[in-house]
């Protein structure tokens, strides 16, 4: 059975306040995106890796790979107008049957245990996402103000979100709507239940300068 990691990296670094897109920023002397690809290659050296990048960033990425001697084999697909369209472009390169894990390119600290958990469960469950507990108090905004809600009723969603390849391709044949905030929401729109597994709290999404400081501390 074929395993594929589809790494989506379309950020422009606006929230980071940097001219360099966040996926290319260095942590410990190595670009974030390289560390992300390494995590999946470490889990399964035979895994197909597809990187989705805006076309205008692809030459720079190749230069970075040459500069760092980065030789993990991967295919590159063009980023789309939205994350939905980027994933759809990447899926066009997926070979054969099996499972596909879609992962944010700026989440380099996903653990090997979480990757394994998601990919192994997806063989049986067909649709699996990692989540972590909400540890802060949560308030719901209302027209009259706000109210406390039970944090036990909520989870924070991470990636990789892993699905049966055929199921995922069919899901992405649906027409795009703004309600598709992640891959699980696309699959759920077909009436398919999504199974939750435990994520790892270190699996942060690096989007701000503070996140970059945390990432450096995690090395």
UniProtKB/Swiss-Prot annotation:
Gene3D superfamilies: Spore Coat Polysaccharide Biosynthesis Protein SpsA, Chain A. The record marks 15, 22 as: Transition state stabilizer. It comes from the Bacteria. The record marks 151, 205 as: Positions MEP for the nucleophilic attack. Pfam families: IspD (PF01128). The lineage of its organism: Bacteria, Pseudomonadati, Bacteroidota, Bacteroidia, Bacteroidales. The keyword Transferase applies. Its EC number is 2.7.7.60. It is an enzyme of class 2 (transferase). Catalyzes the formation of 4-diphosphocytidyl-2-C-methyl-D-erythritol from CTP and 2-C-methyl-D-erythritol 4-phosphate (MEP). Pathway: Isoprenoid biosynthesis; isopentenyl diphosphate biosynthesis via DXP pathway; isopentenyl diphosphate from 1-deoxy-D-xylulose 5-phosphate: step 2/6. It comes from Bacteroides fragilis (strain ATCC 25285 / DSM 2151 / CCUG 4856 / JCM 11019 / LMG 10263 / NCTC 9343 / Onslow / VPI 2553 / EN-2). This is 2-C-methyl-D-erythritol 4-phosphate cytidylyltransferase. One of its GO terms (biological process) is isopentenyl diphosphate biosynthetic process, methylerythritol 4-phosphate pathway. InterPro entries: IspD, IspD/TarI, IspD/TarI_cytidylyltransf_bact, Nucleotide-diphossugar_trans. HAMAP family: IspD (MF_00108). The keyword Transferase applies. GO terms for molecular function: 2-C-methyl-D-erythritol 4-phosphate cytidylyltransferase activity. It catalyses: 2-C-methyl-D-erythritol 4-phosphate + CTP + H(+) = 4-CDP-2-C-methyl-D-erythritol + diphosphate. Coiled coil: none annotated. Belongs to the IspD/TarI cytidylyltransferase family. IspD subfamily. Keywords: Isoprene biosynthesis, Nucleotidyltransferase, Transferase. PANTHER family: 2-C-METHYL-D-ERYTHRITOL 4-PHOSPHATE CYTIDYLYLTRANSFERASE, CHLOROPLASTIC.
